[in-house]
Amino acid sequence: MRTMYCGEVTEAVLGQEIQLVGWINKQRDLGGVIFLDMRDRAGIVQVFFDADTPIATALATTVRNEFCIQIKGLVRARPEGQVNKDMTTGGIEILGLELEILNRSEPLPLDSNQQNSEEQRLRYRYLDLRRPEMAKRMQFRAKVSSFVRRFLDDQDFLDVETPILTKATPEGARDYLVPSRTHKGKFFALPQSPQLFKQLLMMSGMDRYYQIVKCFRDEDLRADRQPEFTQIDIETSFMNADQVMEISEEMIVKLFKEMLNVDLGNFPKMTYAEALRRFGSDKPDLRIDFELYDVADLMKDVEFNVFSGPANDPDSRVAVICVPGGAKLSRKNIDEYGKFVTIYGAKGLAWMKVNEVAKGLEGVQSPVAKFLNEEIVTELLIRTGAKDGDIILFGADKSNIVSEAIGALRLKVAQDLGLVKDQWKPLWVIDFPMFEPLDDGGLTPLHHPFTAPIGLTVEELEANPVGAISNAYDMVLNGCELGGGSVRIHKQDMQAAIFRILKISDEEAEDKFGFLLEALKYGAPPHAGLAFGLDRLVMLMTGTSSIRDVIAFPKTASAACPLTNAPSFANPAVLAELNVAVVADPKKVISE
């Protein structure tokens, strides 16, 4: 039906007769000469019909936007002065010889000026995907997947599929459950990741595994979260953490070079503790020049308990950021930032405008300046590198609250004031704690319970689990976690110890992980791996703000599909066959 794509018609085929198929992007009638902007997934080309083809021209007057058509025409150079440099096909046009309407279109339910809500776009996703920018994102994603496969194939990784119907295991989020018809009262779970199966593949001698795989998590959604998402999943045997990071970094560097012509350079490594101390986040955005500074030593003796209290508490922190040019912020702006930090548990926000550094205490403006002496202010200005016109923002509370609140404030203020540099800043974050405390006094793994500790015996780990550092690593780019992984536990006694630390009884461990504990008995090799979020990676590379823009048929923020009206109620007969009943008040049933 066609000899080439619309977006591929260039001066190279001048004078040739070609056939194209696609959709009408725009129709213009200029006094008997009909111009059609014809679109397919490759781009747009201009076709015109004139008096030399009266039948086709008459038909061209009847077409409207989104009619699906086929044309035969002659490729010509555009007249001088009519070249459109904004189009890849802007140097040519096609003299239409024949026109066939393959299918007509009713008026679109989407606004042609693209003033559509996300709900509308998802309801008519098949129309939304016709938009050139959406088509380009889908093509870009396909090329990223293709590159990843080629790279890993060349590195002798095996593409091995793992089960979708599997066993529910605790991995941090709720599982999507699938009732079994043949095993009454039992359920499969959709995998949150192929974690255990890829470890079993290493125990099977596969050596190097990868998979571009769907994963499922029943959790609250954000702009970068979906109930079903795609991972680039990797696992290796006989590689240490540095080797896994090296090969993963090489893949991402080459991907950015091929797809965006961007040189990412080498990735620096930063410990988890340093990232929290300097940036208040375990995924720091290095495009922002200013960072957090600890000033508790300056505030221990001030007569202002908001500062001196946390300054004298070993579990608390007093930290500041110095925002370049921030003195121009109004009191209203500052109050809004004060409300913002309360989201993260902070009680408020103290501030200090730097009018004239050379004057020390006299050169600053702040409600808390009266509690500070000349020596403290001078050291504060030196430590933060403050300049005239800056503003210093304070956080004083429990360490985790200050890090999270001031770290988030750093990002927000930088975005609001245009202080985020237009560049790519990658890094590795390493040396994460093995565990984090729960409110009930227990512990939970910071990553997952299959991550190995660094340099500890079983006895040493059980004696002080809170102090254990995991052999884990996250790749971060521009404040976004691209992927994460770890060296895995490959000895049964260490894995059993982790379960004990997590208060998982022997019976529960056998029920949920018996197959893993059994497999670890039979010469399991040292192994390590990681997984990248493909959706998030493509989102970053295409410069959009939501992974819904790079997924063909995504869910809404409420985990629903407006296009198909999923989820939907099931037929009672089907539920009966599955031995499943729907209850009006599940909380009441659970309590009973």
Curated annotation (Swiss-Prot):
**GO cellular component: a single term:** cytoplasm
Top-level taxon of origin: Bacteria
Site Important for tRNA non-discrimination: give positions: G81
The entry's protein name is Aspartate--tRNA(Asp/Asn) ligase
The yes or no answer to whether the keyword Cytoplasm is present is: yes
Q: Which residues bind ATP?
A: R217, D218, E219, Q226, E481, G533, L534, D535, R536
Describe the protein's quaternary organization and the partners it interacts with.
Homodimer.
Q: What organism is listed for this UniProt entry?
A: Psychromonas ingrahamii (strain DSM 17664 / CCUG 51855 / 37)
* Record function comment: Aspartyl-tRNA synthetase with relaxed tRNA specificity since it is able to aspartylate not only its cognate tRNA(Asp) but also tRNA(Asn). Reaction proceeds in two steps: L-aspartate is first activated by ATP to form Asp-AMP and then transferred to the acceptor end of tRNA(Asp/Asn).
